[in-house]
Amino acid sequence: MVKQEPETYSWDDFVNDGRTDWTGVRNYQARNNLREMTAGDRVLFYHSGKEKAVVGMAEVVKSSYPDPTASDEQWVAVDLKPVRALKSPVLLAAIRYDKRLSQLPLIRQSQLSVMSLTKDEFDIIVATGDGKTRKKAAAKKK
């Protein structure tokens, strides 16, 4: 999951750009999470600030490389492209309410700008945003 204040760079900005380099991350744990991303990985896009909601899904199109905005080579960036918006934003309040998401870094380390999710956590959030329960989502795959 990547977080951004919509006033700085919104989901709509991202969609209009069609692709972006995710630069400027200067937190060691967030940097380590960027390093773990590889091309083809799916990422959730979270609006922080006033909105506090997961709003879309993106894909990593270029694995980590040295961040061109950093003077120090220890910092990395990845390139992302939008995949699709969720049908409805998944509010932080809904994430906090869902016991299956209680270990989510978004709740436990709220200042972290880039965080890893398990496949189950990712799927739960996407199903919630698309108005499906996990059982309904699983049934459609069969």
Language-model regions, residue ranges each:
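Compositionally biased, charged N-terminal/linker segments
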Residues: 1-39, 132, 140
